[in-house]
């Protein structure tokens, strides 16, 4: 896990790299902070440092962090790329992010993922998702299209009532081309 960056008192959080093979979020957050050191946002550039270093979805224990949250729909699953761990919140990264959320009590959370090119939301985040969609040109989807037991979105957005947006970036697009729309999204979040 990397350090928390930006404004540690912010009520808007942005999280990158739940999955190590989706490094776009880490890069975009780091680039944004180079030009906006006085940000109003709280950033966690990389939740899954091991995954990024090894270019794998899971953490060092083979757990998909986005299936490891203590939700009503968490299930013990087979050990594959979507393995949710031996039990909910078994991973240090999951405990870390839960602690930050509980401590900061954010009013909005944005997580950066890839590759689906959609703005997915959990909880009361449709309006802001539509504004993000207008910036990046991706459709807004309430469902990602498949089951996500133990996901962060379910834990934060549905069960804890914190509007949570999962921005699924285009992995085929050069990450440099994503800077302009994603930075505009960060600026939008700075002003809510």
What spans do the regions from the language model cover?
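Active-site/substrate-binding loop(s) of hydrolase catalytic cores
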Residues: 9-15, 21-145, 152, 162
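Beta-strand secondary-structure signal
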Residues: 1-2, 42, 166
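Short beta-strand-to-loop junctions in surface cap/lid or active-site-entrance loops
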Residues: 1-10
């Amino acid at each position: 896990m990397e350090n928390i960056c930006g404004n540690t008192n912010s009520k808007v959080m942005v999280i990158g790299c739940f999955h190590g093979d989706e490094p776009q979020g880490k890069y975009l957050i780091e680039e944004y902070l180079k030009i906006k050191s006085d940000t109003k946002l709280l950033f966690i550039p990389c939740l899954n440092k091991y995954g990024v270093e090894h270019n794998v979805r899971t953490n060092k224990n083979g757990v998909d962090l986005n299936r490891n949250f203590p939700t009503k729909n968490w299930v013990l699953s087979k050990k594959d790329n979507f393995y949710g761990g031996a039990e909910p919140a078994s991973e240090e990264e999951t405990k870390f992010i839960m602690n930050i959320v509980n401590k900061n009590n954010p009013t909005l959370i944005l997580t950066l993922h890839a590759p689906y090119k959609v703005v997915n939301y959990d909880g009361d985040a449709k309006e802001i998702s539509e504004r993000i969609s207008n910036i990046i040109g991706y459709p807004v989807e309430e469902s990602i299209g498949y089951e996500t037991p133990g996901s962060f979105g379910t834990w934060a957005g549905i069960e804890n009532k914190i509007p949570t947006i999962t921005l699924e970036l285009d992995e085929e697009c050069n990450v440099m081309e994503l800077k302009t729309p994603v930075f505009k999204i960060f600026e939008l979040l700075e002003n809510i």
